[in-house]
Amino acid sequence: MEYIFHQGDFYKEILKINNVNEDDLNIDRFFNEQYDEENILLFKEKLLSFKDKKILLVGDYDCDGICATAIIKRLLNHLDIKHSYYIPSRSDGYGLSEMIVKMAKKNNYDVIMALDNGVCANDALDLAKKLDIKVLIIDHHEYKDIPDCEAFIHPNLLKKDYQNLSAGALSYLFSAYFYDDELSLVYGGLSTLSDMVGVLNYNRYLIKRMMDILKSEDIYEINLLNDNKEIDYNSLSFNVIPKINAISRMGYNANVLVKYMLGSKEECINLLPSINKINDYRKKETEREFNIAKSLINENDDFYILISKEFKEGLCGLLANKIVSEYNKPCLVFNESDGLLKGSGRSKEDINLYEYLSNKKDIFKTFGGHNQACGLVLLKEDLNKLLEYINNEKIKTSEYKKDVIDVEIEDIDFVLYEKLLNLMPFGTDLKEPLFRINNFTYSKKIMMAYKYPKYLVNDILSAISFKSKNNKDDFSSVIGYLKKDNYHKNQLSILIEDLS
C-alpha cells in the first residue's frame, strides 16, 4: 500500500500502516500495575519453597538467555538462595539436556531453573523427575504441550499486554515481584531488543524505561560494551548486542558474559578486551563466510540450501539473514561436521518458514524457532528427504507487502527525523517506515570502502546502500529508511533498500 506524506498526519499514518492503536504505545499503565497472574504466583511460591535448596540456573548462550540468567542470579542473590549457573556452549547443544541433568545430580543440586530454554526438553525433564530434581522453567519458545515441571512462566499463559515477551523480559517481570532493581530492568529491555519479540505494550515499557536509565545513569556494564559512546537504539542493536552474541557464535563459552554483566567495573574493564577481540574476529569471519555462501548460490533456485564445513555453526543464522536480505529468498545455512548438518533458516515476512519446515520436522534431530527464523539439526543422510520435500511442496507466500510512504526530497529534514525518534523503538509489530522518493536526483556518487555506493543529495541528505544490487547510476526512485549519518552528525541519510 502507498501513503502520501503529510507532516501533520505522519504519526497517524505510521499507526495505520502497522494496524496499531495509541493504547499499544501507552506505557503509563505499567508503572504501578499490580500483576497477579496465577502461574507467576505459583512460580513465586515454588521458588520460595526451595529457599533452603541448592539451585542450578541453566541459561541459553544468546543475549536473551544471558540477560535472563543475569536477572535471576541477581534475584537469588537478593533472596540469599544458594545457587550457581551454567550456560551450555554450542557444542553442548541448546538448553537443558540429559547431560546437564546428570551433571546437576552429580553436584548435588536439588532444583534446576531453565531460562530461555526447557519448554521442549522432554527427555531431560523425564530424567530430572527420575533423579528427584525439581525443575522450574521460564521460556518463550513455541511448545506443543505444557512441560512437566514444578512451575512454568510463558508469554502464552499471560494476558494480552504481556504476550510476545522475551525470556529476559519474563525474568524481569518475575523478579519485580520481589524487589525493584534498575540493572535487571536494563537487562530485561536489552533482551527484548535482542530477540525481536515486539515493541508494543509491556515490551515498550521495558525498552523505554531501559533507555531512560541508560541516558541518566552510568550503567558501566552497557557503556563499556558501547565504547563509552552515546547510547541509542541503533548502538544497542548494532554494537552492544552483537558483542554479547559474538562469544557463543565464535565457539567460546558464554558463562564469562554472566560474570561480566554482574561484575564490578574493574572486572568488566578487565574482561572487555577479550570480548571486543572476539567480536572483531566475528565480523571478519562473517564477511569471509558470506563470500563463500554467495559462491554456492544458484540464483534460479526459489529456496537456497547452503552447506559447507567452512561455516561456523554460530554464524549460520547471521549468514542466512544476510542472504535473505541480499536475495529476498528463504535460506537454510548448514555447518557440516561428523555426518551432521547443524544450521539456521531465515525468510522474509511473507513466508512462515517455521510452519513450513514443521510439517517435516520428523526428519530433524532438533528443530525450533519462530515464524521467520529457525534452528535445526539433521543427519547428512537425511538431506535428500529435506530436498525432496522442498522440491515437491512449494513454500507458500502470503500477501504481505511492505508499505511505503511517498515523500519529496524537500520533506526530509530534522523535523521529520525527530518525529521518527519519538516513535522509536521500531520492531516486528511497529515497523520502521519505508520512505519512497520519486524523481530522486543527486549531485555526486562516491564509493564507500570501495564497494558501497553513496549518493550525495544536498547539504543535509545523502543515500547509501550496502546491497550490491543497488550499485546503479541510472534510476529515478529510491526506497529506504531514514537514519542519522553516523559520521556527520548534522546530516541525515537514506539507507537504501531498493532503486528503480
Language model segments and positions:
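Short, well-ordered strand-loop elements centered on a beta-strand within folded domains, enriched
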Residues: A151-F152, G339-S347, K489-L499
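Structural signal for conserved beta-strand scaffold positions within catalytic alpha/beta enzyme cores
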Residues: I87, I137, F152-H154, G189, ...
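Hydrophobic helix-and-loop "lid/oligomerization" segment in the mid-to-C-terminal part
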Residues: E2-V111, K130-I133, D148, Y179-N384, ...
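Conserved phosphate-handling catalytic cores of large alpha/beta enzymes
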Residues: A114, V119-A128, V135-V197, N203-L206
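Acidic, metal-coordinating catalytic cores used for nucleic-acid/nucleotide bond scission
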Residues: D62-G65, D92-G93, N117-A121, Y487-H488
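Short, surface-exposed amphipathic charged segments that create phosphate/polyanion-binding patches used
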Residues: M99-K102, A167-L170, V415-L421
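Mid-to-C-terminal polyanion-binding domains and interfaces
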Residues: L48-D52, E266-I269, K277-I307, S358-S500
